[in-house]
């Protein structure tokens, strides 16, 4: 299963990158170069420097550094667990795997670095004229921005839109973050149990 998903994701990313290149090649180059705006370089400590450092940065690695440990963890975990053809959710280990998956899922959709990349790419493919250097004012932790970003891929990059639409569900993040879920291994379901609602998610090997 994971090999099929990997191929689908690769095709979707290739489609989005091709669209971005043809829509606004300048912004796409800045996107690939990790163009960002660092407000710290506007500080008074730089006032007497000549020339002053520019807050417009290329190869901005701070976001990558902040996200590096999580990135390495979930890639190692997925490769270790799901590349085996005989993988199954069974017993306590199966429940442990599901809990770790929900944690990884929550972290991905709460990752500011990941969402910044997705947001910038969505603006490029949807035809925004200028590159989004400074996105510091946006609230990245929340459902509205993710849904807004997803919709910008709908026409230009249908493959990526389909993947985001199928993979992002706000209640999974809420279930894990607020401990509002229960795994029923026999029925092969995860129940999200909130005060006013109950949602069932089916899982399979």
What positions do the PLM features span?
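Alpha-helical transition-metal enzyme core signature, strongest for iron centers
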Residues: 67-72, 107, 111, 173-176
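Amphipathic, Lys/Arg-enriched alpha-helical patches that create a basic surface
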Residues: 188-205
């Amino acid at each position: 299963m994971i090999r099929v998903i990997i191929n689908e994701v690769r095709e979707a990313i290739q489609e989005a990158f091709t669209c971005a290149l043809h829509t606004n090649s300048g912004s796409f180059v800045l996107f690939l170069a990790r163009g960002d705006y660092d407000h710290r370089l506007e500080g008074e400590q730089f006032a007497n420097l000549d020339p002053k450092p520019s807050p417009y940065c290329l190869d901005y690695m701070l976001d990558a550094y902040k996200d590096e440990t999580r990135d390495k963890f979930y890639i190692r975990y997925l490769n270790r667990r799901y590349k085996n053809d005989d993988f199954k959710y069974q017993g306590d280990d199966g429940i442990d795997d599901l809990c770790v998956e929900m944690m990884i899922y929550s972290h991905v959709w709460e990752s500011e670095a990941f969402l910044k990349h997705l947001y910038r790419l969505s603006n490029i493919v949807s035809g925004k004229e200028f590159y989004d250097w400074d996105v510091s004012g946006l609230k990245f932790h929340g459902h509205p921005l993710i849904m807004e970003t997803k919709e910008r891929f709908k026409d230009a990059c249908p493959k990526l839109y389909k993947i985001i639409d199928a993979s992002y569900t706000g209640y999974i993040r809420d279930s894990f973050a607020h401990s509002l879920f229960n795994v029923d291994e026999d029925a092969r379901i995860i129940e999200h149990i909130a005060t006013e609602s109950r949602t069932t998610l089916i899982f399979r090997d």
